[in-house]
Amino acid sequence: MRVKRYLVFWLVSALLVGPCLARGGETGGEEAFVQALEEDGFIVQKGRLGYLDLIKLHEAGLVPSAYGNNPATKYLAFFVPPAPGHTVDDQISQVQRPPGVSGNVSAFWNLRPDEAVVFVGRTPPECRYFCFDHIIMSRAYGNETRWLFANIADALNNLVIRTEGTPNGTPGNPYNQTTVIVATADRGIDQRIRAAARSAGYSDDAMNTQVFPASILNLGLENDSDTFAIHLRPALFTDQQAGDNYIDNTPATVLRVTPENATQLDPYGYPKLRVRGTGMTELDLTDDLEDLRNAILTRYSGLKARELPASAGFPAGIDAIQRGIDAVGPTNDAAYLWSANQTISSATPPFFNTSQYYGFLRDPAVTLGNDTDEFIIVYGVNHVATGKATYSSFAVYGADVWNGVGSITDLDFNGTAEEYLPDNPDAKYLYVYKIARNCDGDPRCFEVPYGAGGHGIDLDQPLLILWRIYLENATKTGPSYEEIVYDRAIKFDPASQG
């Protein structure tokens, strides 16, 4: 089986261990839109939205790792039919048949230069953040296929998306609003699809284009063409039940739109990027953070302390694309830090075993035993309080299989540093949180679960901490690494431990 088929097989297999795919309702507007597209000479195929439980997939033995799942939220993927005249591999169809899922969709797909993938429906209900991110998943380098998992350009997030509640991207209410997103490489195709949407009653003020720039992509349907994905990332729903309902039964439809006849190509150029940074930094809080560090070390002075490193975790998507390395699925809307001394920079095959790469994450290993005097203190600047983020979090992972077992968000940070710095007015901009095996009722502590499966981290399993810092309001993109103070962590052990 070719590598391309291998990729699709694993992603669709995930549906057997996760919830089923969601599909939007057949509204009159959607049907009129499809009819208008067909009348304009397009072949229209309906896809779906769905999410994959990477932990369950790993526990089922279908993939060797969990690939840095975000335990704070569930990401939806666009499941797209193959181009006309193409099919998903027969083996995949057989695998999907038992749960009754159509075998003719895939979360990984190719795209012709004259095609489009279209989202029509509603945005997520109110949440702290959401975005639609277009991604190059894999690329052929001669006889070698590499896993890139790299965002192509800026995401379409809740601060910039055009919806009925935010016409032309103006400020308003972007949640639970009708929108149309045309993901394409071609200007002419985009214009024709927009015209069809207008004829079906959709407002041009609620239409968006997600550009697949031909200048940096290998578009087409050949075995050496790039493989793509689009992910919808919602985070921290105001009403969790409404959020769960959206994930399970997304009120939207995904369409693959292909012209019946050859068309004169008019490719888009690479889109203009939003620029990180405002010139205002968190760096004046460095002294306060050092005071907090000293207060933590003083409180636990009877224990052995080991300060963990912190560095940027992942390369930017465009950096990974140019270097042919794995980017681990970043978005331009975030900054990523982790408890390691370097950023990853390895070329990897598809669905690689993470325990065979990135040895610096496990050497020297950080483990967490069950002694009451063994724990980790995570502390730093609350980036939401300083205005550098819309939301931020840290998550605990197994450092070998990258299984995220829990996440703490900035909602839990408020008021946690004052007890360490009671007379410091800047303590409100800082946080302290504990990671342990037994929190003994401490409300400011995360209890790391045991277990050899993906839902737990064994006593002797190395772990790491990953910080996510999302979306600065002033720039409508991720914060600049140069303007944030890096988060920190200290591992404490019994003084008698060797």
Regions found by a protein language model. Name each.
Residues 1-8:
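Bacterial N-terminal signal peptides that target proteins for export
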Residues 11, 15-19:
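Hydrophobic core
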Residues 23-498:
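A compositional/structural signature for long, glycine/proline-rich flexible linkers
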